[in-house]
Amino acid sequence: MFLAWERLCTLSCRPKFLKTVWASKILGLSTSAKMSLRFKNAKRIEGLDSNIWIEFTKLAADPSVVNLGQGLPDISPPVYVKEELSKIAAIDNLNQYTRGFGHPSLVKALSCLYEKFYHNKINPNEEILVTVGAYGSLFNAIQGLIDEGDEVIVIVPFFDCYESMVRMAGATPVFVPLRCKPVDGKKCSSSDWTLDPQELASKFNSKTKAIILNTPHNPLGKVYTKEELQVIADLCIKYDTLCISDEVYEWLVYTGNKHFKIATFPGMWERTITIGSAGKTFSVTGWKLGWSIGPKHLIKHLQTVQQNTVYTCATPLQEALAQAFWIDIKRMDDPECYFNSLPKELEVKRDRMVHLLESVGLKSIVPDGGYFIIADVSLLDVDLLDMKDSNEPYDYKFVKWMIKNKKLSAIPVSAFCNAETKSQFEKFVRFCFIKKDSTLDAAEEIIKAWSRQNS
């Protein structure tokens, strides 16, 4: 009986086996080739496998390299922030899951803080969502609000994940550039880079679902003026368009400039998601905590994405962040408040970088906010003929050469551009200056020695 059943099973399986073998022979496919077709990537990530941060962080990982590339502070976070985390780690129930949309004490602190700027009550449970960094906020917003076939306006240069996330949602990024209009007799500043109102208006149509705004801007350091934001707001209202406002550098604004929140403009609260970051606020990028603020009718869709992906964020980190916020909320007019002390500290570092670059004949774009500075390296005489991949933009090859030969890391600015505009920015590199004085000293030594060699 058993043998008969075994033969029957063998016979019943054989046609399927023969069919598979026959197909393989006819198509000339090996088993590995068949598997590669079977397990090919999903279309939504087609062409998105290359990543500037993965590639250049790896190159700069050598301890001998002075890393002014990735926006990675090597200054110490505030002492009280670290102390709060240390205390909280010892509390048993704060090492377990918390509320999926944001730890209660943290959303309450965020509500209290931002009500001072929005001039209206913010419901901590319905109008704030705590996420895995600002990346998480962007992902939730785009996945929760953008549909296949929609168009999303992206301002060039842009933080690289904007384009990738829009494409993963099946939408089409529509690019509009910031254009430089320098003022005679004045150092080139990030404020010289502006949108052409008519060009911007031409990008809006019935398919436009959203515009992604970034102020203060990465990589330029541009802080949008009230008048510039009003132009964007008027177009959003006219075309019934959402605004995803990435404001992670909101506290890092330098003398003579002011940060405005577009969500506070008439008619914009109901159509705006505003994004913030713990990493940029308290110099704790490794904590990977961010938040989205907006009206309930928008935030609820971001909550749906979060509850079906990451579900919740780390409880101890959220509680420590909440306590850190309460400390600074109580002293916002005090120079010791980190929201006030950090930009003052960084403005000194910014000015140092500007002076250093000028001293060796390099033009820079002086940032009005953020902690990056862009330098024009076209005047440096560098032989890049030995670089392997000749198809890469000049700035990619330049930075790789600089890491290898000068032990100094930066980020190529063309990484922040769409394919059509890369050539306009390929002679620029971005340096990060939220660094210890000793790190900046080492960078200065490298740059000045390099300049002496070329003179």
From Swiss-Prot:
Quaternary structure and partners: Homodimer.
Protein name: Kynurenine--oxoglutarate transaminase 3
Gene Ontology biological-process annotations: amino acid metabolic process; biosynthetic process; kynurenine metabolic process; L-kynurenine catabolic process
Positions of post-translational N6-acetyllysine modification: 116
Pathway in which this enzyme or protein is active: Amino-acid degradation; L-kynurenine degradation; kynurenate from L-kynurenine: step 1/2
Entry's Gene Ontology cellular component terms: cytoplasm; mitochondrion
UniProt keywords, alphabetically: Acetylation, Aminotransferase, Lyase, Pyridoxal phosphate, Transferase
Acetylation recorded as keyword: yes
Modified positions (N6-succinyllysine) in chain numbering: 116
Reaction catalysis annotation: L-kynurenine + 2-oxoglutarate = kynurenate + L-glutamate + H2O; L-kynurenine + glyoxylate = kynurenate + glycine + H2O; 3-hydroxy-L-kynurenine + glyoxylate = xanthurenate + glycine + H2O; an S-substituted L-cysteine + H2O = a thiol + pyruvate + NH4(+)
